[in-house]
């Protein structure tokens, strides 16, 4: 359901998103309040993002208003997982680390190497990135990698250690805020 709703969100104007969600969830949240909160959480980035990403992040901020005792609140964080993926791909393309959008579809994120618990950009793949940008890109991919798979894919439920993660509302809200902050950091 959340995936379908997030795709619908990408297709409509930002101004219509709150009404769609208000009708879906039978609540009343003002669109101006959501836009103000996007600016609050992303003061450096809110006016620099592509339209599709902005819509997805508006949806994520809207999801911060959804509260309650849910069985699984993971779906609330789904928009920011998609947004951080798109954000990372845009940076890699803009800094000429990848030649085009198709590269990651064919090769995945092969420009990273794991060092301990973190990932870093392989030195031969820096493109036009500065030292500071290389560090940011490594942190961004580490964050993306450590959150996406355990939230978006089901692990082996028969294994002794199932790493599939389900978020309660509080943890989903925390992940949303941390992701917004990480994206905003790039534009500081």
Residues covered by each model-derived region:
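Short, charged/polar, low-complexity loop and linker segments
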Residues: 59-68, 124, 128-129, 153
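Short, flexible helix-adjacent loops and helix caps
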Residues: 65-69, 92, 96, 156, ...
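Hydrophobic alpha-helical packing segments in soluble, helical-rich domains
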Residues: 76-97
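Charged alpha-helical initiation segments
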Residues: 12-75
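Charge-enriched, short contiguous segments at helix-coil
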Residues: 130-188
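Flexible secondary-structure boundary motifs
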Residues: 93-138
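Ampiphathic alpha-helical segments that act as solvent-exposed interaction surfaces
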Residues: 1-35, 162-187
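Residue-level detector of well-ordered alpha-helical segments, enriched
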Residues: 72-79, 140, 147
